[in-house]
Design a protein with these regions (language model features):
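N-terminal, active-site-proximal structural segment of metallo-dependent hydrolase catalytic domains
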Residues: 1-49, 68, 158, 252-267
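Active-site beta-strand/loop signature of hydrolases that rely on acidic residues for catalysis
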Residues: 4-8, 23-42, 105, 130, ...
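Structured beta-strand-rich core segments of catalytic domains in phosphoester-bond hydrolases
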Residues: 31, 36-115
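Active site of divalent-metal-dependent phosphoester/diester hydrolases
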Residues: 56-72, 168-218, 231-234
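Active-site beta-strand termini and strand-to-loop segments that position acidic
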Residues: 72-74, 95-100, 203, 214-215, ...
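Surface-exposed cleft-lining segments at the edges of enzyme active sites
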Residues: 83, 110-128, 158-162
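Short, surface-exposed, charged loop/turn segments at secondary-structure junctions
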Residues: 120-123, 151-174
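Surface polyanion/phosphate-binding segment centered on an Asp-His-Pro turn
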Residues: 227-267
Length: 267
């Protein structure tokens, strides 16, 4: 079984990083896609822990901006060739996982935007380049693709609806994914169930975080969920998203990360 988890870590501070590590190291997923990483001490501490545990860590540099990292407990081959054409390559990470058959995982952290023209154009450029990247993938690789992360967009049929908030090019992301043959794992597994992965100050829910799979993987979907614990425990402000694919993974390849030691108390 190949299991994948994606989570926006909210540019974790060093103070939050240990608690976040305890949660992540307790998870069974072999691939962790972390979005909104940063160049700060918190992200560095978190990723260094997994490196010391023998995990493979892919974290493209993106000075002064927020990015994406992939942590793998099973062997992977980094694929910077896939992300090179993106308008902001450091906002994505890609690797091919050594499963049977091989699976390519692409994690993205789509830029957020308000109505400031520069931010709108930055987001539009990224989504346009993502569409081009998907279109340029070989057909077989796209069929064995897992795309996931924080898309910073909701679907047209999202509940609650937020009329006037999203621009047509933002909604069009999901048309792009459908045209690429990618299936929303959650919608496939639990049709008609609305989940939320981020909540605004007024308590309004938004589904920003997703996992999509290619046509050859759709029938291998075995399970998945939205996990609210990271948000409820204030480890970050997002829920995690998981999926399980019924694919062969050599058990000898799995590398368990050591537990994070609880801080000592005075009494």
């Amino acid at each position: 079984m190949l299991s994948i988890l994606t989570l926006n870590i909210q540019a974790t501070s060093r103070r939050r990083a240990d608690a976040l590590l305890r949660w992540l190291t307790g998870r069974p997923e072999q691939i962790l896609l972390l979005t909104e990483t940063s160049g700060g001490d918190g992200t560095a501490h978190l990723l260094d822990h997994f490196r010391r545990a023998g995990c493979q860590v892919h974290h493209p540099p993106l000075p002064g901006d927020r990015g994406t990292a992939m942590i793998s407990r099973i062997p992977t081959t980094a694929r910077p060739d896939i992300t090179a054409g993106l308008s902001i390559p450091g906002r994505a990470v890609a690797a091919t996982v050594h499963t049977d058959p091989p699976v390519t995982v692409l994690g993205v952290y789509v830029p957020s935007s308000d109505r400031a023209p520069a931010k709108v154009e930055r987001k539009r450029a990224f989504l346009t380049s993502l569409a081009d990247t998907l279109d340029q993938l070989p057909v077989d690789e796209r069929a064995h693709l897992v795309l996931g992360g924080d898309y910073n967009v909701v679907a047209r049929d999202h509940q609650p609806a937020y009329p006037g908030v999203w621009l047509p090019f933002e909604y069009a992301l999901f048309d792009t994914l459908t045209a690429a043959g990618l299936t929303d794992a959650h919608t496939h597994l639990t049709p008609g169930v609305q989940r939320h992965s981020w909540f605004g100050r007024a308590g309004n829910g938004y589904r920003f975080d997703y996992l999509h799979v290619g046509t050859a993987l759709r029938d291998h979907l075995h399970g998945g969920d939205y996990l609210q614990e990271p948000r409820e425990q204030r480890l970050t402000d997002h829920a995690a998203v998981t999926l399980d694919l019924d694919l062969r993974v050599d058990a000898l390849d799995v590398r368990p990360a050591p537990p994070v030691i609880e801080p000592a108390t005075l009494f």
